């Protein structure tokens, strides 16, 4: 991005899931007479997470879905409650597939452009009806600004955060039930706040296992990892030697 910017119709601040989905839709739908930019601080995208959702309606990600489950479970107090739907599925999209689809559409657009390595620092309305956006590479003006970034004020005021660490685990023997996703297993230690394990079973020998908390404070990485280790041992009688590939 150069220091001299032209006016645009729409500026999207932040290229996370929300910002990318909005920008991909703009890239497909904006008429040639209009323009949009996406400002994202990171320099590139990598497979850093998974995206899961209920397929209540078509959100344009069908070709990215890698796994679907029509059964899900909740475990609490030593009892497992399993539900099933013939209508809706719980869907899993790998981060790299999601990013590839979004960026491919944006990169191929004549109306929407992605600017990586660019941080929006300040947004101020102007008397012209435009908004001026100050970035670390200069200024841009836009008729409409969609800020998809978390509000620092809201984060600071929040009394409860959701925070987690997940492992992608492959095992030497079958231990997972690939027909049922574990949305919440509360039969785990609770001393650091509301805590549950979340399991996406891709096969009998492969799953994503996450230690998830709702609490005020984020914990050290080793705390989550120790809970995941303990869960693999206690829930699946799985030794770390049998977990041959952990990411």
Briefly describe each language-model feature range.
Residues 2-18, 37:
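Beta1/beta-strand and adjacent pyrophosphate-binding region of the FAD-binding site
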């Amino acid at each position: 991005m150069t220091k001299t910017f032209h006016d645009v119709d729409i500026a999207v601040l932040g290229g996370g899931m929300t910002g990318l989905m909005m920008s991909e839709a703009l890239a497909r739908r904006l008429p040639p007479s209009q323009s949009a930019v996406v400002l994202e601080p990171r320099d590139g995208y990598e497979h850093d997470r998974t995206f899961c959702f209920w397929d209540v309606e078509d959100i344009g990600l069908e070709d990215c879905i890698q796994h679907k489950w029509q059964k899900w479970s909740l475990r609490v107090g030593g009892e497992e409650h399993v539900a099933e739907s013939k209508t809706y599925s719980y869907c899993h999209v790998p981060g790299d597939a999601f990013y590839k689809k979004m960026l491919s559409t944006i990169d191929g657009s004549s109306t929407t452009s992605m600017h990586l390595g660019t941080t929006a620092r300040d947004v101020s309305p102007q008397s012209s009806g435009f908004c001026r956006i100050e970035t670390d590479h200069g200024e841009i003006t836009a008729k409409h600004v969609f800020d998809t970034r978390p509000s620092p004020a809201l984060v600071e005021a929040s009394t409860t955060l959701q925070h987690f660490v997940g492992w992608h685990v492959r095992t030497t023997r079958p231990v997972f039930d690939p027909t049922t996703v574990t949305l919440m297993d509360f039969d785990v230690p609770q001393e650091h706040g509301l805590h549950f394990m979340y399991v996406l079973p891709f096969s009998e020998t492969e799953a994503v296992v996450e230690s998830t908390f709702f609490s005020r404070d984020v914990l050290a990485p080793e705390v989550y990892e120790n809970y995941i280790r303990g869960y693999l041992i206690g829930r699946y009688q799985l030794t770390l030697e049998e977990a041959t590939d952990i990411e």
